[in-house]
Amino acid sequence: MADEVILLDFWASMFGMRTRIALAEKRVKYDHREEDLWNKSSLLLEMNPVHKKIPVLIHNGKPVCESLIQIEYIDETWPDNNPLLPSDPYKRAHAKFWADFIDKKVNVTARRIWAVKGEEQEAAKELIEILKTLESELGDKKYFGDETFGYVDIALIGFHSWFAVYEKFGNVSIESECSKLVAWAKRCLERESVAKALPESEKVITFISERRKKLGLE
């Protein structure tokens, strides 16, 4: 019997992008269901009753929540194509450290640029320093996993579609400050899995501009 795979998602979510990319890298066919985050479906509330958030990966009726956990699950469940995590225990731990860093540092700081009035400039400066730390880790490698596109790349690349948002509202230039990281992002976008998962930056800017108006930030 064929696997039934459903992804509850939202187009602009960098976390949903992670799961889309991982599934594409593994060539897993799935039913993509776009959620209305302001009118969540009964299926989403049933499958993720704790956080009530997307993305939710449903595999044969069983939910897997949180995007980094989903990447691991996908890698272990469909091991044949394109390994996403290193097999070496140390390299695996190292990759998990940086993915955790991205969630705790990049996401939290970047959100302040567009969602908190009066903190845009300060948060943008902090974000640049965080991205420079990631740029140092990348070094001269093709990907964060050397020659292999994988876990850390997937964890970070979705934020690239939001870079224009951070630049617009934070009044910074990520390309001039972190040119190596932007070059890495362009390499990632050459992969079909990434190109199809990431929305156009202008679409994200329009969405966030509308959200800011509704939140009374503009």
UniProtKB/Swiss-Prot annotation:
<feature type="binding site">
    <location>
        <begin position="13"/>
        <end position="14"/>
    </location>
    <ligand>
        <name>glutathione</name>
    </ligand>
</feature>
<dbReference type="GO" id="GO:0009407">
    <property type="term" value="P:toxin catabolic process"/>
</dbReference>
<feature type="modified residue" description="Phosphothreonine">
    <location>
        <position position="148"/>
    </location>
</feature>
<keyword id="KW-0808">Transferase</keyword>
<dbReference type="InterPro" id="IPR036282">
    <property type="entry name" value="Glutathione-S-Trfase_C_sf"/>
</dbReference>
<dbReference type="GO" id="GO:0046256">
    <property type="term" value="P:2,4,6-trinitrotoluene catabolic process"/>
</dbReference>
<dbReference type="GO" id="GO:0005829">
    <property type="term" value="C:cytosol"/>
</dbReference>
<dbReference type="InterPro" id="IPR036249">
    <property type="entry name" value="Thioredoxin-like_sf"/>
</dbReference>
<dbReference type="Pfam" id="PF00043">
    <property type="entry name" value="GST_C"/>
</dbReference>
<dbReference type="InterPro" id="IPR045073">
    <property type="entry name" value="Omega/Tau-like"/>
</dbReference>
<dbReference type="InterPro" id="IPR004046">
    <property type="entry name" value="GST_C"/>
</dbReference>
<feature type="binding site">
    <location>
        <begin position="66"/>
        <end position="67"/>
    </location>
    <ligand>
        <name>glutathione</name>
    </ligand>
</feature>
<dbReference type="GO" id="GO:0004364">
    <property type="term" value="F:glutathione transferase activity"/>
</dbReference>
<dbReference type="GO" id="GO:0006749">
    <property type="term" value="P:glutathione metabolic process"/>
</dbReference>
<comment type="similarity">
    <text>Belongs to the GST superfamily. Tau family.</text>
</comment>
<feature type="binding site">
    <location>
        <begin position="53"/>
        <end position="54"/>
    </location>
    <ligand>
        <name>glutathione</name>
    </ligand>
</feature>
<feature type="domain" description="GST C-terminal">
    <location>
        <begin position="88"/>
        <end position="215"/>
    </location>
</feature>
<keyword id="KW-0963">Cytoplasm</keyword>
<dbReference type="Pfam" id="PF02798">
    <property type="entry name" value="GST_N"/>
</dbReference>
<dbReference type="InterPro" id="IPR010987">
    <property type="entry name" value="Glutathione-S-Trfase_C-like"/>
</dbReference>
<keyword id="KW-0597">Phosphoprotein</keyword>
<dbReference type="GO" id="GO:0043295">
    <property type="term" value="F:glutathione binding"/>
</dbReference>
<keyword id="KW-0216">Detoxification</keyword>
<dbReference type="InterPro" id="IPR045074">
    <property type="entry name" value="GST_C_Tau"/>
</dbReference>
<keyword id="KW-0346">Stress response</keyword>
<feature type="binding site">
    <location>
        <begin position="39"/>
        <end position="40"/>
    </location>
    <ligand>
        <name>glutathione</name>
    </ligand>
</feature>
<protein>
    <recommendedName>
        <fullName>Glutathione S-transferase U24</fullName>
        <ecNumber>2.5.1.18</ecNumber>
    </recommendedName>
</protein>
<comment type="function">
    <text>May be involved in the conjugation of reduced glutathione to a wide number of exogenous and endogenous hydrophobic electrophiles and have a detoxification role against certain herbicides.</text>
</comment>
<dbReference type="GO" id="GO:0005737">
    <property type="term" value="C:cytoplasm"/>
</dbReference>
<dbReference type="InterPro" id="IPR004045">
    <property type="entry name" value="Glutathione_S-Trfase_N"/>
</dbReference>
<feature type="domain" description="GST N-terminal">
    <location>
        <begin position="3"/>
        <end position="82"/>
    </location>
</feature>
